[in-house]
Amino acid sequence: MADILHAFREDHEQALTESIQGLLSRHLPNDRAGEADRDRVFLRDVWETLGENGMLGLGMPEEQGGSGGGVAESAIVTRELARVLPSMAVDYVLCGMVGRTIIDSGQHQDLIPGLASGERIYSYALSEPGGGSDLLSLRTQAKLEGDSWRINGSKLWISLAHESDLIFVLARTDEPESSRSRASGLSLLVVPKDQPGIQINKVNLAIMRAAGTCEIFFTDALAPASAIVGERGRGLHALRGTLDVERVLSAAISLGIGHGALDLALRYVCEREAFGGPIGRFQAVQHPLAESAAELAAASLLVEHAARSIDAGLPASQESAMAKLVASECVGRLVDRTSRAMGAMGMAEESSMQRYVRDARLQLFSPVNNDLVRSIIAQGLGLPRSY
């Protein structure tokens, strides 16, 4: 499918698109992506290649060790990664979130070069068992004892925790100011992974199998007193600047899955012959794919608008939430249509289609459930808060 955004791109953005496509064709061909998904393996060599070529440092200032650029550039790389291996696109988005959090805080700036180069990996530990989208219900505690924080609790659905050098942990360090301000008293801490008080287990999911999803148990884990990111008791404030970006880049993952699935289905229906010719000549096959292409193009424009709004410094909470909602719902419908066009062949282990179908499911409830996204959009329209 032709790229509807091609005519709107700056020259450097088109060059970036061609660069990441070339890198992936050489270092992450489809058969290797399939093996990584099947074997649930994080491809560290591909990750480091992305770092060597400046992809991991996008969105981080050059003077601090990054590659410059903004959300629009990060969205390009995210989308192209998701075309090939959506799991790695998830990890890429989390890498960018960590980088932006560090930069926004004005602290721990020495961590940026290693992150941008791919030599070091940092993970976010926010979600907890039973917490879901209700982040404020977390139970992990951090208590300051002398010159160290002592951390106890557990986290779930944490990408790349087993590969990480450092873990950014959201924990309660102080009591909330009131029952109506549960966000107060939460702090974000940088915690060294390799210590006796941290146990990490991989969690085998049917979706995003190569993303390295883990659970973490903290039992008297330690972090230095200087580990706070931002201000003590204002951990959500330290994260807030990344939320809109995360939603836009999550939408870009949906776009990448959609483009990959649609391109695969189009090739298949043009080559597969039945009843005297290619099955792509039948309207019953054409119309669902045409509808999918139209919806994907519309979602792409919304994602592009949200990304450029953030880069321009404009308020974009509504735009980013809408982009996440529309793109993820779009790809959910799209993979249903494209997989039906391919029939059983699309569900064969050797086909990328079955991977797109599985991975598209995550987009409906991650990084935030679409029902909550609808409530966020409704609140932005002036309706009463419902959560």
PLM regions: where:
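A short, Trp-centered hydrophobic/proline-enriched beta-strand micro-motif
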Residues: 118-126, 170
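Flexible, small-/acidic-enriched active-site or ligand-binding loops
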Residues: 137, 194-224
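Short Ser/Thr-interspersed hydrophobic loop/turn segments at strand-loop and sheet-helix junctions
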Residues: 54, 77-82, 171, 191-195, ...
